[in-house]
Amino acid sequence: RGAIEELIVSPPPASDPRTVFVSSTWNDLSAHRASIREALSARGLEFVGMEGILTTPSIPRDSTLAYIGRAGTYIAVVGWRYGSVDQATGLSFTELEYVHAVGQGKPVVAFLADESVAVRPSELDAEQDGFQRLLAFRETLSRRHGAVTFTDVADLARKVMRALGQSVP
């Protein structure tokens, strides 16, 4: 079996419906992640993401995938960077997390930065291959999950809470 299949064929562990795993690139979307964290906390939901995982002693990818398995819902927030690539699979960590969440049967809620949003050059994928992969990933999220666009931090937080109001008890 391939590296990706190895990650998604194991049976999912018991999940907590009030735990939400938030996946995105870090440098360009840290303020957006913080706004989601605050909104979830105000609703009594637990935010799980790379912030708490990076400090664990095990391999970050394995830790991340374990946290996704325990979450009740997976949220993808995608801007204009494909992000760091996992050497074992060739996928960005955000896309790898998405593939794992789908493989585990998690509800997926996806948000994409609107094309009208102004971004700094540092927030863009500089490599052509990364940008093409980003566009393909965005298309997958739109097609398979009806991804919703956002224009800024506050807009994203509102739309996340609206979407979760329909899917989290």
Regions found by a protein language model. Give the residues of each.
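Conserved TIR/SEFIR loop-to-helix hotspot centered on a Trp-containing motif
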Residues: T55-P60, W80-Q104
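Conserved N-terminal substructure of TIR/SEFIR domains
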Residues: G2-V77, V102-Q104
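A general structural detector for well-ordered alpha-helical segments in enzyme core domains, enriched
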Residues: I36, T64, T94-E97, R133, ...
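A short helix->loop->beta-strand "cap" motif at the edges of active sites that frequently abuts
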Residues: G103-S116
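C-terminal interaction surface of TIR/SEFIR-family domains
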Residues: R1-A14, D114-P169
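Short acidic, S/G/P-rich loop/turn micro-motifs used as interaction or catalytic elements
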Residues: N27-L29, T55, R81-S84, S116-A118
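Generic beta-sheet signal
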Residues: M50, V77, F111-A113, F150
